[in-house]
């Protein structure tokens, strides 16, 4: 009895410590973006609502009420309580939700594909704005802490961001352990600052009543809608709760949000409101005005650390999203480097890193202040949230087995709120919202071109390909010279003869004693169980088909996967195996079915793709590349 009790207690202790470890980790990673919103969200919303006039009591209460109920409806109800339950084998995020929706429908839906692509593309646009506005708003505290350094705000921001992107290739494993404690300190500071200032005017707590939010919107017309676009700054980052589901799990994220992060944010926002009610001039920078001059510099340092952590989380999210898009066939194979031997999810994509850095630098140098940049912020996130809501309807309807009317009744209120925020942000189109839309549109065109070009290329290739069964039958009747060893031919179509095999027969006039037609597939799930990794089919004495399946969040490692095939009876020895890979040289054609500019874009994307050898982690010394020229 004692031994059993001790064992059970030990397991519970380990389970409890694991839960709190994940909760602390989620505070350090998941909530960085939304957690740094108090730096600018209330200020921008109140100034926008005042419309050049002094900030009145009704404006402060209206803005606070809008922020509070937006956090309750969009983040708490929609993401924390609803969508966190719509996981794809434990994973979340826009592309994961898209794959889950398609699996629920039992077919590929172009509408869901379009929603997923648009949502993911806008996330990339957001990945450029978040580091720019977050770090810029933190460093702007220098204007109050050391007015003489005001002219160095932009250069210092640029320096911090360049260093941040420069160290990405080294990985973040060593410093990531500090993220949780730093962000806990940040949220505790937010709460303490808020508690201190709520006493300036406790009547600010009246804003809990949604009457003030509704009254503000009804009495301010277009200005109210514009203000709503600024209020949305308080909920940006809410989508990250769902995107990081796979890293920390549902319960740790829910617990961290409901019992720590949300209370700290609300207390701080209400503290800023009370401060402005007692001193309207404080609206100029209501966040930094909450602390005495002596604490300004330490707060600037803490805020900068928090915004760097928030930026790091967004950058890592962009790497993960692009990696998923590559696995799902939405983008060409980008070079992926692994920055940790123990954590497979810690990756670095050099090309994506460079593009993000260029985008972030352009934003900082174009807008120069967080107030200017706030106009550009929001449109990308609101688009992603609308896409998540609509895809969520499909999951609730089909996967949770609810009637369409019930599923619509559950999700419709959230989609209506998201569309309202989207409309409000659209009003800022010419003030800067066009920037993330431009980034997102460029990403959509890139994905569309890659998908369309790949489909056209596959169609053209299949027209000239020879059926595999016909070739095998022909070779059995008239076999060529047989050489020892195993040849593995990579192909996307296991029913046709790989180009590399035809070239080997035509030019070398030999056939290996064992020939494997290898197909690599991506499942609609984040990961594939090892038992489902390999499927083998023997065609003849000399030919076999092998299919390897990977999840869209897995790194395809062919040699490791083929080692699993040994257990299925395949005598696989990598030292006597040659991998034959086809490399296509593409030429544009006026008959391709795409405009010429799209032909050239597709060819450029194809040339920039990482070669199959590196992407599938095949030993370079065992690879034979066969070049072919194809006109699109």
Swiss-Prot record:
Signal peptide per UniProt: none
GO MF entry, a single one: potassium ion transmembrane transporter activity
Protein name: Probable potassium transport system protein Kup 3
Superkingdom: Bacteria
Keywords: Cell inner membrane, Cell membrane, Ion transport, Membrane, Potassium, Potassium transport, Symport, Transmembrane, Transmembrane helix, Transport
One Pfam family this sequence matches: K_trans
Entry's localization field: Cell inner membrane
GO terms under cellular component: plasma membrane
Record carries keyword Plastid: no
Residues that span the membrane, as ranges: 19-39, 58-78, 110-130, 147-167, 178-198, 216-236, 257-277, 290-310, 347-367, 377-397, 404-424, 429-449
Source organism of this protein record: Bradyrhizobium sp. (strain ORS 278)
InterPro entries: K+_transporter, K_trans_C, K_trans_N, Kup
Family to which the UniProt record says this protein belongs: Belongs to the HAK/KUP transporter (TC 2.A.72) family.
UniProt function note: Transport of potassium into the cell. Likely operates as a K(+):H(+) symporter.
Membrane topology label: Multi-pass membrane protein
Catalytic activity: K(+)(in) + H(+)(in) = K(+)(out) + H(+)(out)
Record has Membrane as a keyword: yes
């Amino acid at each position: 009895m004692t031994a059993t009790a001790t064992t059970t207690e030990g397991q519970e202790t380990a389970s409890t410590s694991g839960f709190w470890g994940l909760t602390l980790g989620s505070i350090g990673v998941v909530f960085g973006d939304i957690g740094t919103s108090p730096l600018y969200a209330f200020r921008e919303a109140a100034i926008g609502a005042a419309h050049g006039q002094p900030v009145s009591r009704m404006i402060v209460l209206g803005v606070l009420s809008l922020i509070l109920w937006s956090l309750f409806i969009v983040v708490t109800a929609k993401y924390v309580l609803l969508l966190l339950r719509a996981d794809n084998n434990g994973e979340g995020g826009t592309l994961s939700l898209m794959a889950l929706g398609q699996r629920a429908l039992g077919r590929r839906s172009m509408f869901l594909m379009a929603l997923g692509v648009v949502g993911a593309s806008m996330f990339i646009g957001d990945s450029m704005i978040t580091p720019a506005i977050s770090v810029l708003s933190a460093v702007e505290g220098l204007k109050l802490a050391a007015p003489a350094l005001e002219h160095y705000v932009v250069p210092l921001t640029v320096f911090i961001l360049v260093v941040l992107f420069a160290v990405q290739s080294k990985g973040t494993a060593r410093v990531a352990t500090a993220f949780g404690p730093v962000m806990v300190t940040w949220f505790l500071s937010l709460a303490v600052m808020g508690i201190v200032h709520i006493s300036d005017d406790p009547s600010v707590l009246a804003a809990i009543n949604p009457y003030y939010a509704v009254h503000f919107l009804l009495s301010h017309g277009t200005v109210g809608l514009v203000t709503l676009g600024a209020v949305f700054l308080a909920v940006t980052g809410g989508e990250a709760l769902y995107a990081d589901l796979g890293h920390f799990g549902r319960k740790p994220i829910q617990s961290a949000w409901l019992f720590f992060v949300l209370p700290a944010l609300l207390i701080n926002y209400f503290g800023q409101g009370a401060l402005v009610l007692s001193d309207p001039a404080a609206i100029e920078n209501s966040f930094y005005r909450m602390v005495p001059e002596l604490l300004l510099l330490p707060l600037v340092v803490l805020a900068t650390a928090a915004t760097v952590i928030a930026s790091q989380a967004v950058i890592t999210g962009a790497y993960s999203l692009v990696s998923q898009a590559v696995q799902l066939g939405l983008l060409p194979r980008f070079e992926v480097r692994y920055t940790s031997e123990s954590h497979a999810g810690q990756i670095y994509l050099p090309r994506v890193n460079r593009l993000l850095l260029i985008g972030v630098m352009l934003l900082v140098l174009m807008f120069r202040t967080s107030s200017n940049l706030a106009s550009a912020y929001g449109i990308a996130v609101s688009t992603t949230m609308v896409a998540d809501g609509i895809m969520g309807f499909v999951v609730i309807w089909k996967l949770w087995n609810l009637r369409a009317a019930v599923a619509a009744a559950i999700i419709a209120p959230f989609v209506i709120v998201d569309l309202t925020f989207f409309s409000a942000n659209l009003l800022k189109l010419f003030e800067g919202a066009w920037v993330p839309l431009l980034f997102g549109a460029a990403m959509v065109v890139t994905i569309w071109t890659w998908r369309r070009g790949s489909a056209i290329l596959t169609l053209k290739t299949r027209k000239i390909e020879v059926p595999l069964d016909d070739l095998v039958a022909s070779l059995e009747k008239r076999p060529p010279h047989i050489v020892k060893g195993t040849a593995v031919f990579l192909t996307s179509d296991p029913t046709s003869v790989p180009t590399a095999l035809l070239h080997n027969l035509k030019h070398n006039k030999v056939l290996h004693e064992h020939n494997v037609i290898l197909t690599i597939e991506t499942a609609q799930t984040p990961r594939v169980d090892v038992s489902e990794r390999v499927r083998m089919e023997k065609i003849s004495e000399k030919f076999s088909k092998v299919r390897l399946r990977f999840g869209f969040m897995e790194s395809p490692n062919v040699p490791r996967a083929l080692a699993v095939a040994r257990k299925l009876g395949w005598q696989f020895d990598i030292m006597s195996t040659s991998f034959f890979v086809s490399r296509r040289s593409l030429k544009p054609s006026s008959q391709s079915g795409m405009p010429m500019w799209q032909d050239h874009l597709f060819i450029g994307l194809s040339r920039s793709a990482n070669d199959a050898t590196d992407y599938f982690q095949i030993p370079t010394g065992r690879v034979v590349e066969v070049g072919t020229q194809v006109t699109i």
